[in-house]
Amino acid sequence: MVDLARRCSGSTEGRFLMWECTKWCGPGNNAKCESDLGPLEADKCCRTHDHCDYIASGETKYGITNYAFFTKLNCKCEEAFDRCLTEAYNKEEKESAKSSTKRLQNFYFGTYSPECYVVTCNSKRSGRDAGCENGVATWKKSYKD
């Protein structure tokens, strides 16, 4: 819970970088509580994405160190986020909301293009389940790799 609070608190300087019409899409969040969402369907995707397994900048986890300036997430989370944004786009009725969602998706996966990691268990199962206590991770250029 401490990690979640640290990750979601964000700095006040980063608050102006929040994606339009959202409370969870950007550095940290500006929601009053877990159920506080902006009007875009994509905000639900961002909230879920914010709670994903991650390796913070400078942190070592699963045998790898994140030397990048930004937090990196598990590739499963990145794939789920991309899929969720596509579904959010399809649910939106207003053209402006569709456009904002598509721009968010294009920015995140096109411009920002985050690297991610895959956790593997010694038994070769994909990590983060109850039976994988000592998972080992490897970096990927994208969840699509």
Swiss-Prot record:
One MF term in the entry's GO annotations: metal ion binding
Pfam families named among the record's database cross-references: Phospholip_A2_2
Signal peptide (UniProt feature, chain positions): 1-15
Chain positions listed as propeptide in the UniProt record: 124-128
Subcellular location: Secreted
InterPro entries tied to this protein: PLipase_A2_dom (IPR016090), PLipase_A2_dom_sf (IPR036444), PLipase_A2_His_AS (IPR033113)
Cofactor detail note: Binds 1 Ca(2+) ion.
Highest taxon above the source species: Eukaryota
PANTHER family reported for this sequence: RH14732P
Quaternary structure and partners: Heterodimer composed of a small subunit and a large subunit; disulfid-linked.
Family as reported in the entry's similarity comment: Belongs to the phospholipase A2 family. Group III subfamily.
Record's function text: Scorpion venom phospholipase A2 (PLA2) that contains enzymatic activity, but does not inhibit ryanodine receptors in contrary to imperatoxin-1, another heterodimer of P.imperator venom. PLA2 catalyzes the calcium-dependent hydrolysis of the 2-acyl groups in 3-sn-phosphoglycerides.
Name of this chain's protein: Phospholipase A2 phospholipin
Source species: Pandinus imperator (Emperor scorpion)
